[in-house]
């Protein structure tokens, strides 16, 4: 018998209802009782099975990015980048690759309004011929911290107070006051882009520095940028309050309705490329996630376009069970020594195993669309039918062999084991540059948001003074305005 012929699927529905075991159900409206009013019998397995499944329908919520919307489409190469990478899906202009994208808010719970000030997730899974490739990014190009040992702490600070379950700005600003590298990310967070109008009008960034390797073995650092062809649009606070008060799923609905109407959203993918031999030329560390690579020095290189032209068929199967991880790379693309990236490689796969189980990569939305083979057997919810007798490698009885070798970074790394901060911190220059690039009205809105946040009565004078000092080092004029509005002096 074909083991896959009768796998559960909506295409194999019966004309009548059944139990999960396939038994016909002649009455799904009444429990089995003794008489018309008697007690319900424990032997009513139809009822027990239905209730037991219902009470287990929910799975653990994502610890971050719980609220999300998903769509499917394709990526098409539009420019030749084969001199930069040997990645098969980027081999030539015109090559198309199917993909799925998940947009999300970061901090708030599943079901929370999509109008809250919060970073947005921008995660893309490419189903390539060499396996899946995930770019797990955000709508900000930088992050609040540079070392992932503080990641649980920064998320705890942004999450609701464990006592009251209320998100409070004093907790955020207290924690981040110890980390001046967060200043540049706050220059996005409290900027207009802190509340995107919807997902279609939102940029995406890979945040981390990866490496590209070409066929000759040449390695370059790379950053990924997604630019929406319909432009970037944001919500002001009054608009966010009005929209969020009537539709807490406005961004999800906008994405779904646009695709259903044939108005397919599109983004252009760009690379920023840096030769590792040149990284010491800069006054910042290129592998620091709290820094951008200035585009006037390292310009954007066009690569291709992403088009989302199909809505998902089932929210749970293609959104809740969808799993991304930065460790999903393909030949021609590799990691850098970015501290945040190095630890996310472990953390994301680990949280998926907790949330979905050890066989989460067997779920259809996560499984590669190419042929694959390994000796990962058994485990909870392993529904793959396998009939091999050899479950080890190597073997004289199994022709499986190693894949053809592909180029990987081979830089020699030396150093002393230690817990240290990076040498080039430069925590203030880029934040000041960003602020000075804005028009006066945008600067005023940014100032007002900082004043509102720092006016939280739980914040001490010391913490307010620290932030005034940080911004005074980034831009003297802004620091003076902030100090004047708050009636405080900087501590530095």
Swiss-Prot record:
Its EC number is 1.11.1.6. It catalyses: 2 H2O2 = O2 + 2 H2O. PANTHER family: CATALASE (PTHR11465), CATALASE-2 (PTHR11465:SF23). GO terms for molecular function: catalase activity; heme binding; metal ion binding. This is Catalase. Belongs to the catalase family. GO terms for cellular component: cytosol; peroxisomal matrix; plasma membrane.
């Amino acid at each position: 018998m074909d083991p896959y012929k009768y796998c559960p699927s909506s295409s194999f529905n019966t004309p009548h209802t059944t139990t999960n075991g396939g038994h016909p159900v002649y009455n799904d409206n009444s429990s089995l009782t003794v008489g018309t009013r008697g007690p319900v019998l424990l032997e009513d397995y139809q009822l027990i099975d239905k209730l037991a499944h219902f009470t287990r329908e929910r799975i653990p919520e994502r610890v971050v990015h719980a609220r999300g919307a998903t769509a499917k489409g394709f990526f098409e190469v539009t420019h030749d980048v084969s001199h930069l990478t040997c990645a098969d899906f980027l081999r030539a202009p015109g090559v198309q690759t199917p993909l799925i994208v998940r947009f999300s808010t970061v901090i708030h719970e599943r079901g929370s309004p999509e109008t809250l000030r919060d970073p947005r997730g921008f995660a893309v899974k490419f189903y390539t011929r060499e396996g899946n490739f995930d770019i797990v990014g955000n709508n900000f190009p930088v992050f609040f911290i540079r070392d992932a040992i503080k990641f649980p702490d920064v998320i705890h600070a942004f999450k609701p107070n464990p006592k009251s379950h209320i998100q409070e700005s004093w907790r955020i600003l207290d924690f981040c006051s110890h980390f001046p590298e967060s200043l540049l990310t706050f220059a996005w967070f409290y900027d207009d882009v802190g509340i995107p109008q919807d997902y279609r009008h939102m940029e995406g960034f890979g945040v981390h520095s990866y490496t590209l390797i070409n066929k000759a073995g040449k390695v370059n650092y790379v950053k990924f940028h997604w630019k929406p062809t319909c432009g970037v649009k944001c919500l002001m606070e009054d608009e966010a309050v009005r929209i969020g008060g009537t539709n807490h799923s406005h961004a999800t609905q906008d994405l779904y309705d646009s695709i259903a109407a044939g108005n397919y959203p599109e983004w252009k993918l760009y690379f920023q490329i840096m030769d590792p031999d040149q990284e010491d030329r800069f006054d910042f560390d290129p592998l620091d996630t709290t820094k951008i690579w200035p585009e006037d020095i390292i310009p954007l290189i066009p690569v291709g376009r992403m088009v989302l032209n199909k809505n998902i068929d089932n929210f749970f199967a293609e959104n809740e069970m969808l799993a991304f991880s930065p460790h999903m790379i393909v030949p021609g693309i590799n990691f850098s020594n970015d501290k945040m990236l190095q630890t996310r490689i472990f953390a994301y796969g680990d949280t998926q195993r907790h949330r979905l189980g050890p066989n989460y990569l067997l779920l259809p939305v996560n499984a590669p669309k190419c042929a694959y083979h390994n000796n990962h057997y058994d485990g909870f919810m392993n529904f793959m039918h396998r009939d091999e007798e050899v479950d080890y490698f190597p073997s004289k009885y199994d022709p499986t062999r190693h894949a053809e070798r592909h180029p990987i970074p081979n830089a020699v790394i030396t150093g002393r084991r230690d817990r240290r901060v990076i040498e080039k911190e430069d925590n203030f220059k880029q934040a000041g540059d960003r602020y000075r690039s804005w028009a006066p009205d945008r600067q005023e809105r940014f100032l007002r948001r900082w004043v509102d946040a720092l006016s939280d009565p739980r914040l001490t004078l010391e913490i307010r003074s620290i932030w005034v000092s940080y911004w005074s080092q980034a831009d003297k004029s802004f620091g003076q305005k902030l100090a004047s509005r708050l009636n405080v002096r900087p501590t530095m």
